[in-house]
Structures are given as C-alpha cells and as structure tokens.
Amino acid sequence: CYVIPGGIDVHTHFDLQAGAHRAVDDYYTGSIAAACGGTTTIVDHIAFGPKECSLHHQINEYHKLSEDKSVIDYSFHGVIQHVNPSILKEMEELFEDGITSMKIYMTYDDKLDDSGIYDVLKKAKELGMIIAVHAENDGVINNLREKYSKEGLLTPEYHGKSRSQECEAEAISRISYIADILEDAPLYIVHLSSETGLNEC
C-alpha cells in the first residue's frame, strides 16, 4: 500500500463564460470530479472581464462563483487584459494577497502588445510572480482564418491549420526573448501543441 499526496491541477476553467457558452463544470461539480480523480488542489484560470476592468474585478467575481462550493482547495491565476501603472500596482497587491501567478494572452481581443508584455514580465520578476502565457501569433492566425473562410474551408481541420505550429513557435520565441532581456523573468507556457513550439522553449 502506498500513500501519495493529492494532485495539484494548475490549469482548470471552472464556471468559464465564453460568449454564449459556459463551461459545464462549476466549482462544486468540477471540484468533486477532481477529488474523485485524486486532485486535492486546483488553480483556476479566470475569464476575461469587462474592457479596461481592474485585476481585482475578476478575482472578486470568481470569489463569488467559488464561495462555499468547492470541496477541495483552490486558488486563481489572475488575468491581465491591458497594462498601465494601476494594473502594475494591482499586481503587487494581489501578490501580497496570495495570487502568485497571472495569465496574459498574445492572441484574442485582450492580447497584450510586446511593450505591455515587457512591463508585466518586469513587474512579475520583481515580485517573484509567475506569468502564464497563451502564446500564438495573432496577426498571422487572423490572416489564415480569413483566407480559409473566403475559400469556404470551415471544417474543424482548418481550425488547426489556421493556428499552425509556426504561429505558436514564433510567439513562444518572441516572449522567451523578452523574458531573456529581463534576465530570465519566469514564464509558464500554458498551451504547447507542437514540437516546433517546444523547441523554442
């Protein structure tokens, strides 16, 4: 007989609202499923909030969603949708409150540009915070998506083709170099789908 500690899942999406769709698991059902599989702690990726919202806004919203529901331990990755001095100050405040990681995006409407990425990584390094990143080249993806759409190529295989391994690898390379400029700011690449992308890590 062996006794091992409970698992920690650092990439969940409980109660996630994306447009008209909502994740099937909330903090009650998702945490029960996790516990049944031996996971005793999750760190949930919270969704984007309203445009220009504070970092605290989404953390507070997710505290409301999870309160008195989870049967296991949980925490959150914050989400950064834009960068300004107030956001950088909030990173400090949330870190002091126990939020030790933030997620940024290099694609989608709330992506950060390279200047914003630099500022966030710099602040995170100062704090000892980890930055999780969804790394894809947004501009190329949009061009490929438009190309396939015009050609009527809308089957699921073209979703993958519009997000080529090169789009992933380029973004991983770019953010890795920005982290190197900051003398190894800590990064967590949250989606890695190709050998080409892995080789850029």
Model-derived regions: residue spans:
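Hydrophobic faces of well-ordered beta-strands that scaffold small-molecule active sites
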Residues: 6-12, 42-44, 74-78, 100-104, ...
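Active-site mouth loops of central-metabolism enzymes
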Residues: 10-25, 49, 53, 72-86, ...
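Histidine/acidic residue-rich metal-binding segments in metalloenzymes
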Residues: 86-201
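Active-site loop-to-helix "anion-binding N-cap" substructures in soluble metabolic enzymes
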Residues: 46-57, 61-68, 80-85, 91-93, ...
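Alpha-helix-loop-beta-strand connector modules within alpha/beta enzyme cores
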Residues: 4, 55-73, 77, 119-136
